[in-house]
Amino acid sequence: MADRVLVVVQRYGDVAGGAETHARQLVQQLRPHCDVTVATTTARDYWTWENAFVAGEDRVDGVVVHRFPVAQGRAPDFRRYERAAFRAGHTLADEHAFIDAQGPIAPELLEFVHQRGREYTSVLFFTYIYAPTVYGVPLVPERAILVPTAHDEPAIGLAAYRQVFHTPRALAFNTVEERDMVHRRFHNERIPHDVVGVGVDVPATADGDRFRAAHGITGPYFLYVGRIVESKGCPELFAHWARFKARHDGPATLALVGHREMDVPERSDVRYLGPLSDAEKFDALAGCTALTYSGLLDSLSMIVLEAWAMGKPVVVSSRAPVLSSMSRRAGAGLPYGSATEFAELLELLLERPTLARQLGAAGRAFVAGTYTWPGVVQKYLDLFAEVRARNV
């Protein structure tokens, strides 16, 4: 009998977000093997959690999606709750007030999990930090599989999150680094777990010249893909780029792809291209010298994996524990610790294209050996079997 799997995630469908994209891709990959249903909110954006989708039963990519209204989005004075939860001498009540103020609070979603969660053999909860997971996991602990998408941030140190990491029947990690960090912090090795990851698919027809022609870019370019926002390290990226151009008088361009949530430098060597389709994104990757990624707190970066799968090196901050460690393991990335090192690494890649190709080839091999959908799906099926066996 096929497993019946419920996926609980804070947003689902045509929404921007790493965990949400991960969940949607996984659901599609599991469909041939399981009866999969999704429970989510009606929110489209993660900041306000404003109700944007229609509540009720929906279908996305042929999958039944139950959407429940957000009763409380992010509090207007959220920062006040955040400060209270992280100050010295705070209480557990302060921590739960922070979780509630962060949103999304969706009582009908939790009631669905409570009333119908045991109709499923496994319940996958995506992302540890939000209320649907914090309050949902304890409702079906014997069926819960947590996909924490965790990184070493202040919130994970709050006592209110301990039960989230100790209650599930199993945990599915994205990387070795995420697993090791969670085990160091929570000492929960006893819970069945695996480094499952996510699959990476790239087109064989990506064309860098097509991207250049479409956007009028000549000469070498470095690429950033993602939300252009302070929390992703973009101010540092822009400052480091200016330092690089001050010492490098060549024609290199920084191409920015994604939603802009902050000002972009008005420079002729910085091109903001806005959000692009997947096809255009892969064209951009095909033509770039390297991907630059400035985020520090990712549990996994899909764009880094996609760059490697396309045979491109990545330049990442040495202060990003997961990505810098993965870059070393893959032999496909160059971590920088300062603006000077950033500039030196970009110059190195421009001056030594053979090295860039070698790094990219190592990245392609790393992804092919680690992040393929057949392997990912089998690991999830094994976790489902583990949960099912323990509930007989």
PLM ranges: what are they?
Residues 348, 355-370, 379:
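A short, well-ordered alpha-helix in the C-terminal region of glycosyltransferases
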Residues 258-282, 290:
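Nucleotide-activated donor-binding/catalytic signature segment of Leloir-type glycosyltransferases, i.e.
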Residues 313-317:
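Short hydrophobic beta-strand element within catalytic cores of glycosyltransferases
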Residues 143-154, 161-207, 217:
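Donor nucleotide-sugar binding/catalytic pocket of nucleotide-sugar-dependent glycosyltransferases
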Residues 332-340, 348-353:
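Conserved acidic donor-binding segment of nucleotide-sugar-dependent glycosyltransferases
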